[in-house]
Amino acid sequence: MSDILNLNKTYKQQPLLFGDNLGIYDSIHINQDVFNLHKRAVAQLWQADEFSFSSCQSEFAEDNDGTSLMLETLKWQWTADSAACNLYTLLQPFITNDALTQLILFNTYIETVHSETYSEIVKNGFKNPVQVINSISSDNEVITRLSKTLDAFTELRDLGVKYSQNLLKKEDCYK
């Protein structure tokens, strides 16, 4: 059949990773712990524009250590969460459990909301937000701090591509 929708799947409790390809969504044989994590996460749902960040503009206009620290924190969080927006795409080749799919998709969505929120803070809190976003790629502290995460994400992506093409067995994916 298809690798996209496994219509020949045997419906039973599935391992979270490296099991049968996903088929018809199965909430009958659900991993209750993972499903409960998803329910708890959904209960905390919020939106990037729930708060007006325009009041931050006067605070960020001040030239002091607190403002500099906040800017560095914003740049780091914004960049890290932007990378985390790729979480589902990176894990998808390995996921074989519907509850885990649902949880990781929601978590990926939340990382997108986080990224959007940091973008909104910069857009509304800084006089020149384009300058802030452009400064990230040359901020050695942010890039150095994120490099191990990006290396791990790149390795995970490469493993996922090879695993999807049956060039690796599941045992080859563990390190």
For each feature predicted by the language model, list its residue ranges.
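Non-heme di-metal
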Residues: 2-175
